[in-house]
Amino acid sequence: MPGYSDYIIRNASGLIPMVIEQTSRGERSYDIYSRLLKERIIFLLGEVEDHMANLVVAQLLFLESENPEKDISLYINSPGGVVTAGLAIYDTMQFIKPDVSTLCIGQAASAAALLLCAGAEGKRFCLPNSRVMIHQPLGGYRGQATDIEIHARETLAVRERLNNIMAKHTKKTPDQIMRDTERDNFMSATQAMEYGLIDKVLYDRQVAGHSTDL
């Protein structure tokens, strides 16, 4: 990587690599994710929950403010998680002006699969050995019978909303999405492309429009 040292160091936690940038003013260190953010790459890694969603939303808004015309790349490796957290990211992706290109590395399951298919049309990708899984939202409730009934109605309403969103991005009917998500539905990268969740399986960096210069 031009302009960078040939090694990485690790921060105090020993978990996140640091890169050293050589500039005319000396050296400057970044954690690897901050450095990639400069290239308009956001990582969605691990469980989708409120804290992670807030970080992703903040990065999307920041990159829009930096350049509202340039694409943003969202790299996904996630088992899914909280529906409301996933929808917060989804709504922000649709709200901001830049196109958001999505790329599955590893897995995109549940809410993460929804975010994968919500990328800009023609800019949704999987690496060849990625796995994608779609299913209906999960819920388990305890308490008074009336409260359980309220939560059950909410779960059904959320399911209908998610089916409509996925139908929009896959060009399938909500009824078909409902049938296909009745149980955990695992797909290979090629199957996800055939289903309409992504546009292409990437085997190398040849696709234009993705941040491929690192």
From Swiss-Prot:
Record: active site: 110 (nucleophile), 135
Keywords on record: Cytoplasm, Hydrolase, Protease, Serine protease
Subcellular location(s) per record: Cytoplasm
CDD domains hit by this protein: S14_ClpP_2 (cd07017)
GO process annotations (BP): protein quality control for misfolded or incompletely synthesized proteins
EC number: 3.4.21.92
InterPro entries, A to Z: ClpP (IPR001907), ClpP/crotonase-like_dom_sf (IPR029045), ClpP/TepA (IPR023562), ClpP_His_AS (IPR033135), ClpP_Ser_AS (IPR018215)
Substrates-to-products reaction catalysed: Hydrolysis of proteins to small peptides in the presence of ATP and magnesium. alpha-casein is the usual test substrate. In the absence of ATP, only oligopeptides shorter than five residues are hydrolyzed (such as succinyl-Leu-Tyr-|-NHMec, and Leu-Tyr-Leu-|-Tyr-Trp, in which cleavage of the -Tyr-|-Leu- and -Tyr-|-Trp bonds also occurs)
GO CC terms: cytoplasm; endopeptidase Clp complex
SUPFAM superfamilies cross-referenced by the UniProt entry: ClpP/crotonase (SSF52096)
Role played: Cleaves peptides in various proteins in a process that requires ATP hydrolysis. Has a chymotrypsin-like activity. Plays a major role in the degradation of misfolded proteins.
Known partners and oligomeric status: Fourteen ClpP subunits assemble into 2 heptameric rings which stack back to back to give a disk-like structure with a central cavity, resembling the structure of eukaryotic proteasomes.
Name the UniProt record assigns to this protein: ATP-dependent Clp protease proteolytic subunit
Record lineage: Bacteria, Pseudomonadati, Pseudomonadota, Gammaproteobacteria, Legionellales
